[in-house]
A protein has these predicted regions:
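Conserved C-terminal portion of the radical SAM core fold
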Residues: 1-51, 97-116
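Short secondary-structure boundary/capping segments
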Residues: 25-26, 54-60
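Radical SAM enzyme core and accessory elements
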Residues: 51-56, 67-169
């Protein structure tokens, strides 16, 4: 921040090795980062024939249908993490909370309080809706700034009109 550089962090979710504790600790660590920063959340991709593929299958952490390719086309829809993708509710909970950490207008104290709720971990719908709303606000701020600078194009407007492409950083 002292040098005027905005940090960008890339995180990988949908990792079969990460535990609930790992996800909680990641959330808590990122919650200590000073604003401004952007988070880019990606879904782990296991490619057929890769070393990762072999090790995860050998250790029983994934099955052949978890490998991206012919039987699994998740990578087409889930390269960047999307809250509507079907995954375990606890994972969606942590992803939604983590997405909101990069939004300085969302109080961290609220997010930290929500992170401790066993009810919300099992029923993350309110957290997902809050994350979606925060993403819309950030997208509006970004689009407004681009429009003011004359950078907004019809192509960008069309691209952003899809819920699948909402800005989640």
């Amino acid at each position: 921040h002292r040098l005027g550089i905005k940090p960008h962090f890339q995180l990988i979710f949908d990792d079969p090795v990460s535990t609930e504790e790992d996800k909680r600790k990641l959330f808590e660590m990122i919650a200590t980062f000073p604003h401004p920063y952007d988070l880019y959340l990606f879904s782990m991709t296991v490619f057929p024939g890769s070393e990762l593929n072999k090790k995860l299958i050998e250790n029983g952490l994934i099955g052949k249908y978890d490998v991206d390719g012919i039987d699994n086309t998740r990578v087409f829809y889930q390269h960047r993490v999307n809250l509507s993708y079907p995954r375990p509710v606890e994972d969606t909970f942590w992803i939604a909370l983590t997405q909101m950490l990069s939004k300085p207008f969302v109080p961290r104290s609220l997010l930290k309080g929500m992170s401790k709720s066993a009810f919300l971990r099992q029923h993350p719908w309110p957290v997902i809706q809050m994350a979606n709303a925060a993403n819309f606000v950030k997208m509006g701020q970004l689009a407004g700034g681009m429009a003011m600078r004359g950078e907004m194009t019809r192509t960008l407007v069309r691209r952003w009109m899809s819920m699948d492409r909402i800005i989640t950083t």
